[in-house]
A protein has these predicted regions:
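Short aromatic/hydrophobic "clamp" motif used to bind/position activated sugar donors
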Residues: 78
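Conserved short acidic donor-positioning loop in nucleotide-sugar-dependent glycosyltransferases
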Residues: 16, 31-32, 60, 83
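Glycine-rich, basic loop-to-helix element that forms the pyrophosphate-binding segment
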Residues: 56-73
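C-terminal subregions of glycosyltransferases and related glycan-biosynthesis enzymes
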Residues: 147, 171-172, 192, 196-264
């Protein structure tokens, strides 16, 4: 998804163009950007036919934009990339090689660039799980692995998500949790790797760190909506122990967002 990212878009596109695996699609979903980022992408697209640009008729938010990107894709495997982040050069090659082994989902580690560069998840070792084992693994992690970045998904399984939730649901916060939650419920074979394939750039003006009152209020409303959808869908899946732990985390996050929105 692309929205007002002119400060970062050249770097992220260059990281895609320079992938060691050349047979890839680079899909850009412009969510009504108001800066020069779309024009910058158009210049890149003139030089690389793998770059395909789609423009939303109105601002739809991150969740809907990603979903529309999936529908426009022709690949069996999908990776998501935020416009202020970037990939390691071999990210697609590593993911493609592993997905060909029959996995439903790959989870990788990522570098986080803040004051210092650190590994985000810090997985101790490479592991393969069935669904129950993976949900147990998630429950014990410091971070629940909810981000859609640093993962590789199967397109046919993503389409199952669209049977459970509106494709154009307007969400720009809490959307990763909703997407991954539904996807995890369909997974049977999952691999976790300690290899870092993704660079997450700390952006003080980004959605998650922004202190603007209007954005904070919208973040809270989006998170609340996401949690409500997850709780409604949870009745369809029989993982009571996992859901109990999950709801504790989600409610804590929602309460924290509410406090941030009311504090400023």
């Amino acid at each position: 998804p692309l929205f007002n990212s002119c400060d970062f878009i050249s770097r992220v596109l260059q990281s895609c163009i320079n992938q060691t695996l050349k047979d890839i699609e680079i899909l850009i979903i412009d969510d009504k950007s108001k800066d020069n980022s779309l024009n910058m992408v158009l210049e890149f697209a003139k030089k690389d036919p793998r770059i395909k640009i789609f423009q939303n008729e109105e601002n739809l938010g991150t969740f809907a934009s990603r979903n529309l990107g999936v529908l426009h894709s022709s690949s069996d495997f999908i990776m998501f990339l935020d416009s202020d982040d970037f990939l390691t050069p071999d990210a697609c090659e590593i993911a493609f090689k592993e997905m060909k082994k029959g996995f439903d989902l790959l989870c990788f580690d990522a570098f986080v660039h803040r004051v210092k560069t650190k590994q985000f998840y810090r997985f101790k070792q490479d592991e393969v799980f069935n669904q129950k084992e993976f949900l147990d693994f998630l429950s014990k992690q410091r971070h629940f692995c909810w981000s859609v970045w640093a993962k590789c998904f199967r397109k046919d399984m993503i389409l199952k998500i669209f049977e459970k939730v509106k494709i154009d649901e307007r969400l720009s916060y809490g959307e990763d949790v909703l997407f991954c939650y539904i996807y995890f419920m369909f997974c049977e074979k999952i691999a976790v790797f300690k290899t870092c394939i993704y660079h997450y750039e700390f952006n003080p003006n980004g959605r998650y760190e922004n202190k603007n009152q209007e954005i904070l209020n919208q973040n809270y409303q989006d998170k609340k909506k996401s949690n409500e959808i997850i709780k409604r869908l949870s009745r369809e899946f029989l993982f009571d122990e996992f859901h109990q732990k999950l709801f504790e985390v989600l409610e804590r996050e929602e309460k924290s967002l509410c406090m941030r929105a009311n504090k400023i």
